[in-house]
């Protein structure tokens, strides 16, 4: 079997499994049985596909076409999106005046120490 034939068989089996799964979900017992048997067939064909794909890769049959290679390179070369740079606008008389009023100057708070009272224990009894 060729690699293309094996891939075609796998896609056909997957489609039939999918259709039978929909029927089995609705309660069709025969469809559920078909899903089980087809999944076993799929396993066997998948093993064959793995072997054939490894052989094809070693022989150089699975190289990308030039069109696919160019698309991959173009996708890799695209730069990441630039982050937005927010520029501050120049102050006009109205905007600067309102900003100055909005931010009042804070005065430094004076620190006051609370008096700590210590309990004195008498040692006399």
From Swiss-Prot:
The family this protein is said to belong to: Belongs to the histone H1/H5 family. HCT subfamily.
Sorted UniProt keywords: DNA-binding, Repeat
Top-rank taxon: Bacteria
Protein name from the UniProt record: Histone H1-like protein HC1
Cited function: Might have a role analogous to that of eukaryotic histone proteins.
GO function term, MF aspect, one: DNA binding
UniProt KW Repeat keyword: yes
Coiled coil: none
Tagged with keyword Aminoacyl-tRNA synthetase: no
């Amino acid at each position: 079997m060729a690699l293309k034939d094996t891939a075609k068989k796998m896609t056909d089996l997957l489609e039939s499994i999918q259709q039978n799964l929909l029927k089995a979900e609705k309660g069709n017992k025969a469809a559920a049985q078909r899903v089980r048997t087809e999944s076993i067939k799929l396993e066997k064909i998948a093993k064959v596909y793995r072997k054939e794909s490894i052989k094809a890769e070693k022989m150089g049959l699975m190289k990308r076409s030039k069109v696919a290679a160019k698309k991959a390179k173009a996708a890799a070369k695209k730069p990441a999106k630039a982050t937005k740079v927010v520029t501050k606008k120049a102050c006009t008389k109205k905007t600067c005046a309102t900003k100055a009023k909005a931010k009042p100057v804070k005065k430094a708070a004076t620190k006051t120490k609370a008096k700590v009272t210590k309990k004195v224990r008498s040692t006399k009894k």
